[in-house]
Amino acid sequence: MTRAFNFSAGPATLPESVLRQAQAEMVEWNGVGASIVEISHRSADFMAVAAAAEADLRSLLSIPDDYAVMFTAGGATTIQALLPLNFAAPGQAADYVITGHWGKTAIKQASPYVDARIAADAETGGFIDIPPAASWTLSPHSAYVHITANETIHGVEFRDTPEVGTLPLFADFSSSIASEPLDISRYGLIYAGAQKNLGPVGISVVIVRRDLLERAGQPRADIFNYASHVARDSMLNTPPTWNWYLLGLTVKWMLEQGGVQEFARRNAEKAALVYGAIDGAGGFYRNLITPAVRSRMNIPFFLPDEQLDALFVSESKAAGLLALKGHKAVGGIRASLYNAMPLAGAQALANFMHDFQQRHG
């Protein structure tokens, strides 16, 4: 069987070696006589899986000791609703920087629980750039400042950590975590749905500075209390064990491949191939994003008309290049180049783009 190149924005492509290992271990895992999905999450066997996943993630991301790591069920949207409940006092403000669709989602989810203020909004400019941090309107007593590190739909990315003074910086890293080195100590909290760079859909990672867990937050059930999750090693309730196991395999694979430094090199090379095909097409392909904030993970582009967009998607699929249709909010084409996408995939896409232009340009 030949696997196609999957450019899906999420759930996204996973390393083939990880999938093969999971396949081999699905029915009977590690000599225990049962599948990993059948054993208790509180068994010594699974506790070892969970501990290894955290240890490897700490190594991969160089997570400082004064930061706690949680593995939570669900995705980033759930986390966005829980942030103000855990870290904002009743009536307190929180600042949000809106640089795309997911920044808008973050403030929407938080708004019922906090005085959510827009510190900067790139929508008026069409989400093609990121307002400089010096221009943001921050509330001096804000609970936190929230950014979306990489916008998968519009294709803009913070290339540097913004300076927000003494306010805790919270960031959604769902689509760019582990794609390049990151100084986590510059953040109060980062979070990520796993389904782009860390593993399968259905589990997320929250990394939080421990002193922030001392905040009283707002009245909430214990299941929504992050301090309780940390105290119970992410097992306050039954976790998604299969997802956690696959996340652990994926993180271990990234370490074996050379870690975030190596993936930063690979990702820059892959992105350069696709952006090179766009910029060298004489306007046949268009990416509207300011070059300094172009995403390396998600590259949207447009052809001269919607009919050509549709033809591009159809022909690329036939050529073994999957999931290139752009998000319904913006249309066009989108190529997602997460860590598990090999260089050969980016090269195949660039070659196809050149061939398509020769035939239809």
Curated annotation (Swiss-Prot):
Positions bound to pyridoxal 5'-phosphate: 76-77, 102, 152, 172, 195, 237-238
SUPFAM superfamilies: PLP-dependent transferases
Modification sites for N6-(pyridoxal phosphate)lysine: 196
Cofactor note: Binds 1 pyridoxal phosphate per subunit.
Superkingdom of origin organism: Bacteria
Binding residues annotated for L-glutamate, in chain numbering: 42
Family per similarity comment: Belongs to the class-V pyridoxal-phosphate-dependent aminotransferase family. SerC subfamily.
Protein's job: Catalyzes the reversible conversion of 3-phosphohydroxypyruvate to phosphoserine and of 3-hydroxy-2-oxo-4-phosphonooxybutanoate to phosphohydroxythreonine.
Annotated protein name in UniProt: Phosphoserine aminotransferase
